[in-house]
Amino acid sequence: KRQHGSEAYRGSRKGRKSDTVIGVGDVLTKRLEQKNIKVVHDRNIYDVKNGKEERSKAYNYAATAIEKNLKKYPSIQVVIDLHRDGVNESTKLVTRQNGKRMAQIMFFNGLSRTTKTGDIEYLYNPYIVDNLAISFQMQLKAAEYYPGFTRRIYLKGYRYNMHYCPKTLLIEVGAQTNTLAEAKNCLLYTSPSPRDM
């Protein structure tokens, strides 16, 4: 798993990785390991370089680490890229599941094409259909067990490093309007996993 490490939540303490999407990744790691799924959790920050936020280059910085991890651990079957969405301050992405307030999640897919320009040749991705399939399967499974837990699947024109593995999930866990507890709860108290697919 990798993430935009500086993405934080309402009430997050500045400078603490555990209060950002990295801390949410820690919860997901623990949850998957409880299901006997081996996890390589990349806790590095790719959207800040030399103390300066550089979100536009984060995917380039992360690509090297993804390649390195896939080479080092060739048995990796699923790549999960965690993010936190940015929404209007009045937008609340909260649901209640298992008696807990939790952030809604959104599966995000890069298509390497736009309706205006067609295929983006330099962003070739042989796994577009595979990635869409796992997002759709996860969305259906979540809707079956936890109605209202997921938002719509978001489709965007670029690639988002989804070309390295046929099962890549880019997941937006809540938004800046969610508390850290809501973000962590959504992965702590729900159970569909990529193994279910």
Where do the PLM segments sit?
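Active-site-proximal helix/loop segments of hydrolytic enzymes
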Residues: 59-64, 70-74, 78, 84-185
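N-terminal catalytic or cofactor-binding beta/alpha core of small enzyme domains
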Residues: 1-76, 85-91
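Single conserved hydrophobic/aromatic residue that forms the stacking wall/gate
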Residues: 189-197
